[in-house]
Amino acid sequence: MKCRPTLNTDQPRVRKKLPERFPKWLQRPLPQGSAFHATDATIKRSGMPTVCEEALCPNRAECWSRKTATYLALGDVCTRSCGFCNIGHSKTPPALDPTEPERIALSAKELGLKHVVITMVARDDLEDGGAQGLVDIIQKLREELPQATTEVLASDFQGNVSALHTLLDSGITIYNHNVETVARLSPLVRHKATYARSMFMLEQAANYLPDLKIKSGIMVGLGEMEGEVKQTLQDLASIGVRIVTIGQYLRPSRKHLQVKSYVTPETFDYYRRVGEAMGLFVYAGPFVRSSFNADMILASVQDKASA
């Protein structure tokens, strides 16, 4: 019969130190205050979803403290289920809400937005991918906020160029479509979307309206190589994209894609310099997202153009 080893109860128990969930550069205080709560109240009154909330954006507190928000248009149910995204999905989302344009416009007016950013769920169930729904929002914004600039982060409309032209003809200030990741990882990261089709749609926009400010963005930390990021920047620059955002991918839940690496601030700065050498305006950093500080990015691009 084996004897059970005697525990030495005189020795203090040593608790192993667990690794930090995030590196130090991803740890920051969450600003809140009267402006944050005022923005929160305005959003709640409008009944409109924001990508800030639906996508669990880490910048929500900071943006709302500045009285800025990004509206999620065409409902809050997406027809795609990308591995990085927290937004709900279904093959049969609800019909478009005819009150949505007015609610977005009045909410933006109450916040006093000078630059309004609209993003959308993919609506592959609609013939035009929701393009006309976006136009209706832009038109209502123009009625309520005639001096405001507008930015739309659109889906790829399944490659429907006619739908793209419908959106571009609305007179938006910035057309944004994210390629999201490098070419090799696109099949893993994105659902029903391809790197080639995203590049095609961005190039079509640049050819259709050469003076339009065209923007795209990628996430890093998904397993990409440095050379692949540089190639993506080169691909974007070669087709007429002028603005690129680069941010750290953060896993919304255990059901989503794993983070492969935490990219250092120094590496983000390196990517910025690489992109700028290609003629791009690059906004890069751990917390950067497509719509983060979008008003400041536009102002910087305009200042650079007029210099």
From Swiss-Prot:
InterPro entries: Aldolase_TIM (IPR013785), Elp3/MiaA/NifB-like_rSAM (IPR006638), Lipoyl_synth (IPR003698), rSAM (IPR007197). GO terms for cellular component: cytoplasm. This is Lipoyl synthase. Its EC number is 2.8.1.8. Belongs to the radical SAM superfamily. Lipoyl synthase family. It catalyses: [[Fe-S] cluster scaffold protein carrying a second [4Fe-4S](2+) cluster] + N(6)-octanoyl-L-lysyl-[protein] + 2 oxidized [2Fe-2S]-[ferredoxin] + 2 S-adenosyl-L-methionine + 4 H(+) = [[Fe-S] cluster scaffold protein] + N(6)-[(R)-dihydrolipoyl]-L-lysyl-[protein] + 4 Fe(3+) + 2 hydrogen sulfide + 2 5'-deoxyadenosine + 2 L-methionine + 2 reduced [2Fe-2S]-[ferredoxin]. Its cofactor is [4Fe-4S] cluster. The keyword Transferase applies. Residues 64-281 form the Radical SAM core domain. HAMAP family: Lipoyl_synth (MF_00206). It is an enzyme of class 2 (transferase). Signal peptide: none annotated. The gene is lipA. One of its GO terms (molecular function) is metal ion binding. [4Fe-4S] cluster 1 binds at residues 52, 57, 63, 291.
